[in-house]
Amino acid sequence: MKSKKKKKKVTIKDIIRLIVLLVAFSVLLYPTFSSYLNEKNGSKVVSYYDEESVKLSKAEKEQMLEDARAYNKEMLGNIDFIDPFSQEDVEIDARYESLLNVDGSGMMGYIRIPKINVELPIYHGTSEAVLQAGVGHFWGTSLPVGGESTHTVLTGHRGLPTKTLFTNMDKLEVGDIFYIKVLDETLAYQIDQILTVLPQETDSLSIEPGKDYATLVTCTPFAINTHRLLVRGERIPYEEATKQEPDTNIKPELSFTAKVLIVTIIVIFIGLMIAIIYSIRDRKRRKVR
């Protein structure tokens, strides 16, 4: 008679190996999954902003926009630029913080960039707390309500381990579209200039008479941050913009790599559970013998 092949016993070492694999893949997945959760939370913040805006009367919204436009006119020729990422210690006046502050959270609107699939809240100022939460409006520049002779500047971080923010801003090209939503108004901007400058080089952030600009600012090169990447858009009619780049809601998505990691973790977890069950059975059999 042929001898039966002995079944390989599940050892403690096998279980430890599976646990190590499970932990390793979980660590690899954490930044991506955490970023995904933060983006979902950001979408909730944006939705809440829209809900709060709807509660305001037409007269209240018009007054808020009028106050913001009046502020922009007052700021003309009265701007002393410094690097947006050095504004941590700048004292911001209470009047500025009250403008476009729909629900008291400091959120004045949000930006949507279809090309890089981001939708981010815009807050007053560029303190580190603000830049960890979303995009900061560079205090001293025009509030993002559009109009002739305005230039709003919005800043965001790149390369945070748990948030995307402006990480992929270097993928934007001249001709791409981004949208800024404030109250009921959606402003469309088409990118017309991309510059890489030193932190102190802020001339390109100045207002040009008759122009309606919005510039996005982030640090570059990635993880080195010695320079600033400036992506400027010029206002174009909303209807014209949507023909080139539809203004649709952006939903956070997990990357293909993240999905593969999740499936791998599930498979390893199931394998670990099976290994533990077999190990327990083997021990019970040995005790019976």
List the predicted regions and their residue ranges.
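Solvent-exposed, non-transmembrane regions of membrane-associated and secreted proteins
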Residues: 8-256
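N-terminal Lys/Arg-rich, disordered targeting/topogenic segments
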Residues: 1-10, 284-289
